[in-house]
UniProtKB/Swiss-Prot annotation:
It comes from the Bacteria. It catalyses: 7-aminomethyl-7-carbaguanosine(34) in tRNA + S-adenosyl-L-methionine = epoxyqueuosine(34) in tRNA + adenine + L-methionine + 2 H(+). This is S-adenosylmethionine:tRNA ribosyltransferase-isomerase. It comes from Legionella pneumophila (strain Lens). One of its GO terms (cellular component) is cytoplasm. The keyword Transferase applies. SUPFAM superfamilies: QueA-like. The gene is queA. Monomer. The keyword Mitochondrion does not apply. Transfers and isomerizes the ribose moiety from AdoMet to the 7-aminomethyl group of 7-deazaguanine (preQ1-tRNA) to give epoxyqueuosine (oQ-tRNA). NCBIfam families: PRK00147.1, queA. Pathway: tRNA modification; tRNA-queuosine biosynthesis.
Length: 337
């Protein structure tokens, strides 16, 4: 298939620039793959469409304030986006500067803090901080809003560009399907008899990388670290053995589950994945997916197309556009069953 097969015309005013006042105020477009029927609801109603015994798998990765601003010894401005923390003091980052940095260069930050460039690794730079990197980011870092949110980060983003169940620090972009869940929705889901389990996948900046190849099969996915625990494997197998559904909350949860089942059976693991899911992929674990509405020609639209069918995906997205759904990270959600 070609990249253009996944194009749709999205009015710019449908790209959500801010979250709604309440997380569960988001709209919810529900699609049933068997009946090909869909309906329009509010996200707070989602428990009504889940069944006792269903297993929701959520990504508990926590967004770090990964964007830093500093300057070189010459005074030239430097902007960093931390891609991956590799140790207490070391990390890989994207760096923007007027002139490319080299090994041993220093980057000066506020409050007398500084970073040292150790070496270049392809498009990234391995750097070392003058103190624990997580502490430094929490002091000076900015929330790394996606490129399609056309504004600077604000104080509200520290809370709202984060799921209420985020626990494991490491993502530079939010697992956005989880942003709609508040404590009331989680309580209603549990009261319904639905089980919840967690995976961790640290979302990298590569999630926003466009597909540049004409043939989508030629696209090389970015790599992200994930972990699937023995407890999660047990929960998935228990659900499957009872004939219950495993529903991924977000494409990151789905990609983690499918990556851990590449051999046909879900196994515990902690490693990198660059799995690329597009039409023709045979799903091994996931029976349902909760996800936002994604960019035209993106790998995430290709994943949704693989899950519900290409024509069905394009028709569903056109329905969302016609009904003025809000798109992307701070936008509305879909439940695909």
């Amino acid at each position: 298939m070609n990249k253009q097969d996944f194009y749709f015309d999205l009015p710019s005013e449908l790209i959500a620039q801010y979250p709604l006042a309440n997380r569960s105020d988001s709209r919810l477009l529900i699609y049933n793959r068997q009946t090909e029927e869909y309906g329009h609801y509010q996200f707070r109603e989602i428990a009504d469409f889940l069944q006792p015994g269903d297993l929701l798998v959520m990504n508990d990765s926590k967004v770090i304030p990964a964007r830093l601003y500093g300057h070189k010894a010459t005074g030239g401005k430097v902007e960093l986006l931390v891609e991956r923390i590799t140790g207490d003091f070391t990390f890989l980052a994207h760096i923007k500067a007027s002139k490319s940095l080299k090994s041993n260069d220093l980057i000066y930050l506020d409050a007398g803090k500084r970073l040292e460039v150790l070496q270049r690794q392809d498009d990234l730079f391995l750097c070392k901080a003058s103190e624990n990197i997580l502490d430094l980011l929490n002091d000076l870092g900015h929330i790394p809003l996606p490129p399609y949110i056309d504004r600077e980060d604000e104080s509200l983003d520290k809370e709202r560009y984060q799921t209420v169940y985020a626990k494991c620090a490491g993502s530079v972009a939010a697992p956005t399907a989880g942003l709609h869940f508040d404590e009331a929705v989680l309580s209603s889901i549990r009261a319904r008899g639905v089980n919840i389990a967690y995976i961790t996948l640290h979302v990298g900046a590569g999630t926003f990388r466009p597909v540049r190849c004409e043939r989508i099969q030629d696209h090389k996915m970015h790599s992200e670290w994930f972990t699937v625990s023995p407890d999660l494997c047990t929960a998935v197998k228990a659900a499957k053995s009872m004939g219950n559904r495993v529903i991924a909350v977000g494409t990151t949860a789905l990609r983690s589950l499918e990556s851990a089942a590449m051999g046909g059976e879900l196994i515990p693991c902690s490693r990198d994945t660059d799995i690329f899911i597009y039409p023709g992929y045979q799903f091994k674990v996931c029976d349902g997916l909760i996800t936002n509405f994604h960019l035209p020609e993106s790998t995430l639209v290709m994943l949704v197309s693989a899950f519900i069918g290409h024509q069905e995906c394009m028709a569903l997205y056109q329905e969302a556009i016609d009904k003025r759904y809000r798109f992307f990270s701070y936008g509305d959600a879909s439940l695909l069953l």
